[in-house]
Structure formats: C-alpha cells, structure tokens
C-alpha cells in the first residue's frame, strides 16, 4: 500500500476567523472548534445550530467550507486531545471555518474527504498528532507542517468510498444511541 504525506494530496489552511461580529463585514455561519470537536460530520440539517458571526470578504473566500472538506482542531489544552476532525457532508451557504481549526481540502482525484475523516480518527493519527504537538503546560498546537506531515494510505478511490461509508454508517448509529441516552437521562430527571 502506498502512503503519501497529507500536504501532497490536500490543501491545508489554518483559519483566523473569530466569533466577533462587525457592521462592515458579511454575515456567515461559523463552524467553530466545538462543532469540529463534537461532530463526525457537519450536515445541512445542523445549520440552525451553527453560530452566526461576520467575516471579511477575503476571509470568506479563504476559509469557506465546501462539501468534501475536512476540518481539524489545531489547538488543545492536552496533547492527546488535539487534531479532532469532522467531515463537511453538504454544501452550506456562507459556512466558514472558525479560528483554532484547520481546513483540509483533499485533491478529489486522489483522496476522499470522507475516508480522510475516518483515517484522522484512527489511533495512529491521534498518536502522531500528540507526538507532534508543540507547547507546554496549558496550551498545545499543531503547526501547518505537523498537520501536513501525516502519512496517509492512498487506496483506490472506490475502496476509500466503501470504507468511509461503513464507518459513517457506524457513526450515525452511535449518534442515534447518544440521542436516545440523552433523552432517557432527561426523562429520568423530570420523573
């Protein structure tokens, strides 16, 4: 199996779009650190949950998120909790990536975003990013170089799609179970 560095098969950029709103900027939906950290995928049915903020036109052009992109958290208070990822499953109008995160746009002829997201959740990647995070004590970060150096298995696209679909299906079932558990917990508190 062939492995290639992520930076060879994807475009990577680190966002600096903050949560503040300014009158002279355009309204956007912000995909924040917490959105990336907590979700396997960002879908159009989550639009109402995303924060509304503003951004400059050049920030919108640079950090707009599109179907197939993958986002990761690049900062954390602990090394073992860095580089969490999410997949952008749908095109969502005015969706922009917030700060403390990096956008990874796979080269579609080589790499599936869904597959990349699943790969970024593996223990191999978790450990790689933990060992390559810089900082001390209270804040750790992944540099653009550290993010791009991860070796990614390059399988035929159809094989990537099959593997990603199985893992996405499992994740959807986990999400349903979480919602059921949350509802049961809320019901128990009311009773």
Enumerate the predicted regions with their spans.
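A short glycine-rich beta-alpha junction/loop motif
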Residues: 94-102, 134-164
